[in-house]
Amino acid sequence: MKKTIAMFLALCMIFALCACGGTDQQGTGQPASAGTAADPSSTDAVTADPAEREYVIEVLRLSNDGGDFGGPNPFRHSTRGPGSTKMRHVFDSLLQEGPDNYIPWLAETWSISDDNLVYTFTLHKDALWHDSEPVTANDVAFSIDYYAKNPNNGGNLFTADSSIIDHYEVTDDYTIVIYAARALSTNTGNIGTLPIIPKHIWENVDDPYNYDGDDKYIGCGMYKLVSYDSATGSYQFEANESYYGHKPAAHYIDYVPTSDNILAFENGDIAMTDVSADLYDAYAARDDIAMIPKNDEMGYRLMLNMDKVPAMQDVEVRAAIYKALDRNKMVDSVFQGLGHVASAGYVPQTNPFYSDDVVKYDYDAEAAKEVLVPLGLKLRFVIGQDTPAEATLAELVKMDLEAVGVEVTVESYDVPTRDSMATSGDYDILLTYHGGWNAEPVSMLSAIYAGTPGKSKWVTYGYSNDELVSLIGSIPGIFDSSELKDAYNKAQLIISEDIPQLPLITQVSYAMYRPAEYNCWQACFNSTQFANCRLSYTSDFEF
């Protein structure tokens, strides 16, 4: 496992903003170098002096990312990044993704045996649940057992229907030893980031997915939930004054509805937002703004429902649809050139595990016509409302397909509804936009190409490939870096040959913020989505 992580991290660029500063009624901060990505080694920004003020910022306001992402507990939250982030404000895990590797969190110390099978975690002895009950190793043990019967949203305790944990031993009130069923490179993340729940609450709950007790949002995290409105997607969190770990940077975190994030940012209504490609130059030149690059972190896929449209079970038809799409034009029109045509093997070209040895599907409308015109396909095209760019991309897809004889009807829904329709298979083709493209690929490959239809919003209806499923399933057990690269190369080749889904374009995107207002943003090693990293909400984490 150590070799696997080391290889990935050595090839990835990690951006971390280590100094934390800001302004509120009690103090001021100094901006980082404006118009550029923040310097990972910078410590020039003024940090909050605990003697002068308790928090870097009184209220940190962020966009709600387009809607409701579920209640922030392990059984109610959306598995998209914004949903998981809100849950992780409230419910802590043993470990946390740090800038370079996993770091201690609820566990004060931890170790792994040389054979990668035995994990020992010793908890912070002063950790408390939000109702002031102590957190103990028995809560960790209970969480493992409870999730075995009631899987948490996005949980990874099971691989191919078998638990990754063989057994555990609680050796004292604050120490648990977990024995893995087999050595997997993914065990550290899957075990370490499991949200821990309080035994004294959930042991009396038979149906956690519908439980509505007043204590359903009691965790031991850095923040407590103050309010949540599913109708507007609004959330407010308050700093946990009894928190055992890092110092919360904001007194309150508010997620607010926004119709236009750029306008909201300009008006000072939110502290951070992505910047569209057409506005990048203007904002990068401003002295009061810092930019964070997120290279190929986000991208679009076109999902194909082969059960609803049996003609698409023919790979020649799928290839024709792919060739009908002018993806270079999509990069130019949607991302103003700040992006890439996605690989048919899914893994983007900026990912260290990318393989160029995949089937290429260049734009060829005439070849597509020969296959598609005789079929007379009529497709119901479901899209979301993630970003204004999505409507633009959908229109380009529609135009390209209609130019080769495919009739397309576009239906637009809010993000949660679109995701629900993806899970249930309520579409012919569906456009989805998500992050995680540039992380180590195994998690996304498992979700997209080895999942079960009806259980995940990522999976293709009407497609299965046992060889690919077996290959992806073997990847977590590979610790040799050369063998790992070979396995990823083979998986990408199979995916590009089968093209059960059509990766379209990936985005070289940027987030922007005002360092003088809030400068605590951090990157986790497996993602450049700064707003989704727990460390971004602490004022005392040092890189």
Please report, for each region that a protein language model flagged, where it lies by residue:
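Structural transition elements
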Residues: 8, 340-371, 387-390
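Alpha-helical secondary-structure segments
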Residues: 61, 136-143, 173-177, 222, ...
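N-terminal lobe/hinge region of extracytoplasmic solute-binding protein
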Residues: 61-114, 145, 218
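A structural "hinge/loop" feature
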Residues: 64-85, 106-108, 133, 187-196, ...
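Gly/Pro-rich hinge or "lid" segments in bacterial periplasmic/extracellular proteins
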Residues: 81, 192-248, 542
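Surface-exposed binding/hinge segments that line
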Residues: 111, 158-204
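Ligand-site clamp/hinge motif
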Residues: 240-283
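Detector for C-terminal structural segments
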Residues: 324-353, 389-398, 423-543
